[in-house]
Structure formats: structure tokens, C-alpha cells
């Protein structure tokens, strides 16, 4: 009876003990690129503001990862003197520039009109477009007709393979976490 109680208490302590934060979520130190050591949790001190967590934003069929403060103004544009080309060779654009580019693309996507595919107004617009830029439209249609469409069988085959890979990865992660738990309990 005491052994069961002791094992149960040990399992609860392991399950409810705070774990160290993920290395990717460590806040950056004063030296760029050098992570700070994780701080122990102290429930008696007042909360400190945390860094914002990444947010996944969907635009069409693509996903973008947004890091940073979402309350910051999205209207910030790149100034001509701070373009990535003038920042120096081999250097990356700053986070503010990346955020400005991200929000610029997001606003462009949101401002694009959304209309149904089979509407009569779209057919009329296509006719006007063909009359104005007939040569360009013809080249685009010709290019599309040359590319063979992806068959549904291939699509579903690829989807099945991706799902199997995800399932195998999930099982491997579960086995790894079980192994770690057994090592902790075994000690």
C-alpha cells in the first residue's frame, strides 16, 4: 500500500514539475544570437511581461509565421535608405523590415477582391481583358494548357505518404518521451 502511494506521489511530482523552456523559446541575451540561461520559476514574484509567441497566419494556401508584437503598426514601410540591398552584402534584413514586408503582403492579400469563379461579371471582365491584352492572355492560356494537371490518384498518394510520415514521427516522439519517463522513474 505504501509502495503504491509512494509511486503515485512520485509520478505526480514528475508530471506536475515545471520543465525547462524549449531552447527555441529562450529569450535572446544582450549579445545577438546568444541565448540567456533559463530563469527558475518563482510564483511569489509578480509576473514579468513575456515575449510574444509566434502566430501562424494563413494567406491563401501559404502559411506565414509572424513573430513579434501584433499591436505594432502594420503600416510601417521600408524606407528607401534601409533596403536590404543597401544594408550590406551578406546581411539579412532586420526584424522590423521583415515585419513591414510581411504586413505589406498581408494588406495586399486582404485588399484583393474575392468573387465567385463562375460569375457572369467575371466572364465579362475576361472578355474585356482579352480585348485589351489578348496577346498576353493567349500566351498565359497556352502556357497553362502545356502543363499537365496533377492527377487525383497522385495527389491522394502523396497525401497518404505525408500522413504516414507524420504518424511515424508522432510514434517516434511518443516512444522517446516514454523512454525518458521510464529513465526518470527508474532512477
Swiss-Prot record:
Q: Which UniProt keywords apply?
A: Amidation, Cleavage on pair of basic residues, Hormone, Secreted, Signal
**Compartments reported by the entry:** Secreted
Q: Gene that codes for this? A: Crh
Q: What does this protein do?
A: Hormone regulating the release of corticotropin from pituitary gland. Induces NLRP6 in intestinal epithelial cells, hence may influence gut microbiota profile.
Enumerate the Gene Ontology biological process terms: adrenal gland development; associative learning; cellular response to cocaine; cellular response to dexamethasone stimulus; diterpenoid metabolic process; female pregnancy; glucocorticoid biosynthetic process; hormone-mediated apoptotic signaling pathway
Tell me the PROSITE patterns matching this sequence.
Answer: CRF
Parts of the chain that traverse the membrane: none
**Region called Disordered, residue ranges:** 75-95
**What's the protein name?**
Corticoliberin
Q: Which Gene3D superfamilies match?
A: 6.10.250.1920
> Which PANTHER family does the record cross-reference, listed alphabetically?
CORTICOLIBERIN, CORTICOLIBERIN/UROCORTIN
Q: What does the sequence similarity comment in the record state about its family?
A: Belongs to the sauvagine/corticotropin-releasing factor/urotensin I family.
Q: Propeptide residues, per UniProt?
A: 25-144
Please provide, in alphabetical order, the Gene Ontology terms of the cellular component aspect for this entry: extracellular space; neuronal cell body; neuronal dense core vesicle lumen; perikaryon; synapse; varicosity
Region forming the signal peptide = 1-24
Amino acid at each position: 500500500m505504501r509502495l503504491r502511494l509512494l509511486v503515485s506521489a512520485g509520478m505526480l511530482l514528475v508530471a506536475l514539475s515545471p520543465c525547462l523552456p524549449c531552447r527555441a523559446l529562450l529569450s535572446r541575451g544582450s549579445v545577438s544570437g546568444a541565448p540567456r540561461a533559463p530563469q527558475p520559476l518563482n510564483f511569489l514574484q509578480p509576473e514579468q511581461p513575456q515575449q510574444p509567441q509566434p502566430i501562424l497566419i494563413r494567406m491563401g494556401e501559404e502559411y506565414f509565421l509572424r513573430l513579434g508584437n501584433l499591436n505594432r503598426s502594420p503600416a510601417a514601410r521600408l524606407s528607401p535608405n534601409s533596403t536590404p540591398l543597401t544594408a550590406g552584402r551578406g546581411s539579412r534584413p532586420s526584424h522590423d523590415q521583415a515585419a513591414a514586408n510581411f504586413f505589406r503582403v498581408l494588406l495586399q492579400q486582404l485588399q484583393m477582391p474575392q468573387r465567385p469563379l463562375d460569375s457572369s461579371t467575371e466572364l465579362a471582365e475576361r472578355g474585356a481583358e482579352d480585348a485589351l491584352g489578348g496577346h498576353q492572355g493567349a500566351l498565359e492560356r497556352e502556357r497553362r494548357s502545356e502543363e499537365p494537371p496533377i492527377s487525383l490518384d497522385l495527389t491522394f498518394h502523396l497525401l497518404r505518404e505525408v500522413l504516414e510520415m507524420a504518424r511515424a514521427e508522432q510514434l517516434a516522439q511518443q516512444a522517446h518521451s516514454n523512454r525518458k519517463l521510464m529513465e526518470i522513474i527508474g532512477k
